[in-house]
């Protein structure tokens, strides 16, 4: 498992599916077994205690994302009047004292995937592309087949990232695969999320980013 300190208030975990299996879990356990999900979460927090100076006490905001080869988990300390309204109190040293409804909230809102058949028309798939440099973003803006993509360009920690959204009512799997294959000719798939970029990055070009880049460069 990899642990990365994003900033003073946010920690990112990345755990591969192979690592999950070595720890005695499988993907179905994590998504659908509440006790297994809870066990994995506390294992991660225990490991964090020894590797980073990050106290998980108090309200936390947790985001879990399923990637192709593993899970990415962001744990952010909530602040009063901010994310604290949506967070919940966690005390690492005594998880058994947590209220049952708080554990269920964690598992239901963050560890349970939404089934495709339950998705509404407004649901959107997200892809984050990391550019090696800005010239690659300019080159991508001139590529064909991407004219109607919903894109936003961010700068974050000295790098450029393109947030691409695929509304599920407009794109099927084949369309998405074709678009992603073109995108990957100009950059790399990033483990960052749209939330992280919106929260901590700087918007360089808002929607539609590629059209604006092509216009100005």
UniProtKB/Swiss-Prot annotation:
Domain of life: Bacteria
GO molecular function, a single term: protein-macromolecule adaptor activity
UniProt-listed InterPro entries: MecA_C_sf (IPR038471), Neg-reg_MecA (IPR008681)
Pfam family, one: MecA
Cited function: Enables the recognition and targeting of unfolded and aggregated proteins to the ClpC protease or to other proteins involved in proteolysis.
Notes on the domains: The N-terminal domain probably binds unfolded/aggregated proteins; the C-terminal domain interacts with ClpC.
Subunit details: Homodimer.
Record family assignment: Belongs to the MecA family.
Protein name: Adapter protein MecA
Record organism: Listeria monocytogenes serovar 1/2a (strain ATCC BAA-679 / EGD-e)
Gene expressing this chain: mecA
């Amino acid at each position: 498992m990899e642990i990365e300190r994003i900033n003073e208030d946010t920690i990112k975990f990345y755990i591969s599916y192979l690592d999950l299996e070595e720890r005695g879990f499988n993907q179905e356990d994590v998504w659908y077994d509440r006790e297994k999900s809870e066990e994995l979460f506390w294992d991660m927090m225990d490991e964090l205690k020894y590797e980073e100076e990050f106290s998980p006490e108090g309200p936390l905001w947790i985001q879990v994302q399923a990637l192709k080869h593993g899970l990415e988990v962001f744990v952010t300390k909530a602040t009063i009047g901010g994310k604290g309204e949506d967070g919940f109190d966690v005390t690492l040293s005594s998880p058994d004292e947590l209220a049952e409804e708080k554990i269920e909230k964690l598992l239901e809102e963050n560890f349970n995937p939404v089934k495709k058949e339950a998705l509404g028309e407004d649901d959107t798939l997200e892809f984050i592309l990391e550019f090696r440099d800005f010239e690659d973003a300019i080159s991508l803006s001139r590529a064909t087949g991407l004219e109607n993509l919903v894109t936003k360009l961010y700068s974050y920690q000295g790098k450029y990232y393109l947030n691409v959204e695929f509304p599920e009512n407009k794109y099927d799997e084949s369309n998405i695969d074709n678009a992603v294959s073109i995108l990957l000719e100009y950059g790399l798939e990033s483990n960052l999320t749209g939330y992280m970029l919106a929260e901590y990055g700087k918007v360089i070009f808002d929607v539609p980013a590629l059209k604006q880049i092509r216009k100005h460069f």
